[in-house]
Amino acid sequence: MRRNGKERKDRTSGGSQRPYQEIVGRTWIFRGSHRGRVTKRNIIWHELIGLKVRVVNSMHPGFVGIEGYVVDETRNMLVIVGDKVWKVPKDVCIFEFETEDGAKIKIPGERLVGRPEMRLKKRWRKW
């Protein structure tokens, strides 16, 4: 550990260069009872973080078969943690989400593109 010259405070190194590495391989994920029921009709507006997901089909063959839990979501990517960490683009994949009651919901990634808070405002056609 190095010292800061002027203020004489201890400096520690920055955070991990690989985020989410500390939870790789764990079988649990935080799932509170406050979560609403996820159904096929409301999954577009629902929070995806914490749901179990599997990539069923993709334009890129390297993404097919990835499965784990969603730990982060950006506008165009899902961060999935299973036995390692993957950043999967939403628009080129078809995802299969598993709900708490064991139901499996397939949804094309194009329907999920956008920030989670902006998806609430967007109007969707029935599908």
Curated annotation (Swiss-Prot):
Reactions that this protein is recorded to catalyse: Endonucleolytic cleavage of RNA, removing 5'-extranucleotides from tRNA precursor
Homology family: Belongs to the eukaryotic/archaeal RNase P protein component 1 family.
Cell compartment(s), UniProt: Cytoplasm
Subunit structure: Consists of a catalytic RNA component and at least 4-5 protein subunits.
Keywords of the record: Cytoplasm, Endonuclease, Hydrolase, Nuclease, tRNA processing
Coiled coil: none
Gene Ontology biological process terms in this record: tRNA 5'-leader removal
GO cellular component: cytoplasm; ribonuclease P complex
EC category name: hydrolase
EC number: 3.1.26.5
Task performed by this protein: Part of ribonuclease P, a protein complex that generates mature tRNA molecules by cleaving their 5'-ends.
Lineage start: Archaea, Methanobacteriati, Methanobacteriota, Thermococci, Thermococcales
Domain of life per record: Archaea
Principal cellular location given in the protein's record: cytoplasm
Name of the featured protein: Ribonuclease P protein component 1
Gene: rnp1
Pfam families assigned to the protein according to its UniProt record, in alphabetical order: RNase_P-MRP_p29
Family matches, as SUPFAM superfamilies: Rof/RNase P subunit-like
Gene Ontology MF annotations: ribonuclease P activity; RNA binding
